[in-house]
């Protein structure tokens, strides 16, 4: 018996020593990588402070399309937002390639030329500062630069079968609310020298039900009482290639278009501190040939009315561009803290990173991780018949730690293809995207895994909205969208969406949606848009509680929603 006890003690000691050695090895690797990254950031050259483009800005889709067409060939476009100067750098690549006769006249110019012309007007001051084009002396290129964007939207929404509101995907916590209403926001920005930038964006909504800060049914609907609020307010400071940003804002981490698994602008904007590289950089020494890198991180505070008031979220993302046609990303979110939790930053995050999953007490946390990619595939006879080839992208995520390779035990995924030009010399594109957070339930039988947590019962959410994909847990989403320029300044788009939410419940929601929208550029600084969306919902759901997060589905109800909207945006 004593021998058995001695053997067990010896085995436990060996296991402890092995774990300590493993942790020491991890620390050495992490320390070595951190030293290289810090050196790269400090000696990567000076990045000029610049305000971020808002996530809904048309320039993102234009730059992505030029990248998919191969006109821009060295861009990191997955992590958003990025700055105006970063966007101008990508536009400059296209201009320089055209000047160097590196772009063949093969039909891509039908869409590339009007897009590039519009981008050159939008980022003219930045292009002048980069020496790409000459200025007239009247542009705002001095040490004090400023601008503004005003957008006003008039909506007429008719939500059927007594469902007074319906969540609006990727709109910062907003709803479709019955009736006619107006939404107007003013976004002003200021850049000071090469070291500071400020953004202020207040917003007015005439119907307080269109912005939800709580459940949409039940007694807590009294929380939804805002007519005006600060949508974004931030200060960014830059030194060398390091950017520190403090304030309120939104981010989109992932290549998905209709959604992304971990971080989108579906929920209300986060109050946060961001730290990262202002532009892509190379590692020093022999590692330079590995390609370009970019690092983003943030520490955010969630809302007050939840399981643990003002719980924290720490996010870390590493983007890697090993070749001009391939972009890879690694993301990790850690939820911790809040009133009464007794946890602190950064100690809790470090413990969560190094410890096995399902810890207790002060080391307990809620985690998500994701690997994603975007790849451009050239035209290949008989296989890829499209004139400019196509782009494929995907995301593979894990709820909690990535416990097994290659597919985690609590997986979700997103996959898509984007064809920037369907026919030679034409302007029509096509996107097909599929997302699935129901994979784990179908595989293991466990329900409600994604965006939920046993300790943090409000989940990885803000005001009941997932920080990631709008469809939520145990859901599938099929999205198809195609756009075509009727003229250089008039774009027609049509989309289709089929979505099933909360498939693990006896009664779950099914949505069939089709929409059409038209955008006209009156000038490079002014655009007018109008659209119509038809929705047919079976068993529509409404949020009834935040702690724990609860959604109720109206069994046997089929609702038809008619959604009209029009907007005008002007930049100064």
Language-model features: where?
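Asparagine/serine/threonine-enriched low-complexity, disordered tracts
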Residues: 2-23
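Extracellular loop and loop/strand-boundary signature of outer-membrane beta-barrel proteins
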Residues: 170-174, 216-221, 258-263, 302-304, ...
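Signature for the C-terminal beta-barrel architecture of outer-membrane proteins
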Residues: 252, 272-457, 473-480, 485, ...
